[in-house]
């Protein structure tokens, strides 16, 4: 699959795909004999992984570290596990904070909706 096709499939720019590869967020992509990127299923798996992890807010550095560990072989499985466990905990912490914020917004929305109906704003 060409970089253009991958770009269209995942709605991500070609420049971003090149950047991800250049900084190590995805391993080097398979290339044709003339040096053109030729994304294979394994390459697409890495692209999907990066898109998912970035959309979850994982730091670029953590994604790069994970890719590096994967490339070093099975002896890094414990380190990969630890990295993923830490990132999962970070995501759970973020979700908890977002839930607190959501509750506060719900409360304020409720107060303002009541104020629109009654003509009076109350924080009781």
Where are these regions (language model features)?
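Basic helix-turn-helix/winged-helix DNA-binding cores
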Residues: 1-65
């Amino acid at each position: 699959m060409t970089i253009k096709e991958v770009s269209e499939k995942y709605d991500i720019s070609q420049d971003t795909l090149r950047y991800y590869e250049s900084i190590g967020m995805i391993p080097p992509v398979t290339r044709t004999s003339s040096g053109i990127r030729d994304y294979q299923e394994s390459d697409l798996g890495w692209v999907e992984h990066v898109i998912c992890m970035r959309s979850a807010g994982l730091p670029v550095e953590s994604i790069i570290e994970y890719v590096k560990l994967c490339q070093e072989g099975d002896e890094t499985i414990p380190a990969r596990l630890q990295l993923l466990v830490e990132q999962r905990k970070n995501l759970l912490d973020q979700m908890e904070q977002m839930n607190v914020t959501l509750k506060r917004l719900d409360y304020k929305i409720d107060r303002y909706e009541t104020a629109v109906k009654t003509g009076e704003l109350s924080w009781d």
